[in-house]
Amino acid sequence: MSTKTNSTKATSEKTDSLKTNRGTKSSAGYSEQNTPLGGCILADTPITFNENKPVTKVKVRNTGDRPIQVGSHFHFFEANRALEFDRAAAYGKRLNISSTTAIRFEPGDETEVPLIPFGGKQTLYGFNNLVDGWTGEGVVPNSERPDKLEAIRRAAERGFKSSK
C-alpha cells in the first residue's frame, strides 16, 4: 500500500513541477515555456496573406433559387452556373479569403468579391472541366496551351451565366 501511495505522490510531484517550472508570462502573453498543452502562441502582429497579389473585384449575383457556397481555392471562373458575374475577369482566379473557408451566396443576393490569381504553375484541372490547363497570363510555359477564349465559349455553351 505504501508503494502505491509513493508512486502516486511521485507522479503528483512530477506534474506539479511541470506546471510550476514553465517560465513566466511575457508582456505579449504566454512564452513557449509556460503555454498550456495544446495552447497557441500568437504573434504580436497580425499574420497577413496574399498581400503581394493583384486583386480583381467582381460583382456576383445568385440567379438561382438555392444558396450557393464557393470555397477559397475553387477556380471562380468555373463556379456554379447560376452565379452571374464577369467570368472572363475571373479566369485563373480564386477568392481572396483564408484557406478552408468559403463565401455563401443567397438566392437573389448581389455582392462584390475579391479575386486573386492562383499561385504556382497556374495549371487547373477538374472543377467543371471548362479549362483543364494553364490559366496564367504572360509568357506561356512549354507544353501549355492557354485557351481563355475557348473556355469562355464553353462556359456560355454550357449555360454558365456571365454579366459581360
UniProtKB/Swiss-Prot annotation:
Segment Disordered: which positions?
1-32
Give an example GO biological process: urea catabolic process
Where does this one sit in the cell? Cytoplasm
Q: Which gene encodes it?
A: ureB
Alphabetized, the UniProt keywords read: Cytoplasm, Hydrolase
- The species is Yersinia enterocolitica serotype O:8 / biotype 1B (strain NCTC 13174 / 8081)
Tell me, in one coarse class, where this protein mainly resides.
Answer: cytoplasm
Which Gene Ontology terms of cellular component type are present? Answer: urease complex
Please state what the protein is called: Urease subunit beta
Quickly give the catalysed reaction: urea + 2 H2O + H(+) = hydrogencarbonate + 2 NH4(+)
**So, what pathway does this thing act in?**
Nitrogen metabolism; urea degradation; CO(2) and NH(3) from urea (urease route): step 1/1
> Which ranges are annotated Polar residues under compositional bias?
1-10, 20-32
Q: What family is this? A: Belongs to the urease beta subunit family.
What Gene Ontology molecular-function terms does this entry list?
A: urease activity
Q: How does it assemble?
A: Heterotrimer of UreA (gamma), UreB (beta) and UreC (alpha) subunits. Three heterotrimers associate to form the active enzyme.
What InterPro entries does the entry give?
Answer: Urease_beta-like, Urease_betasu_sf, Urease_subunit
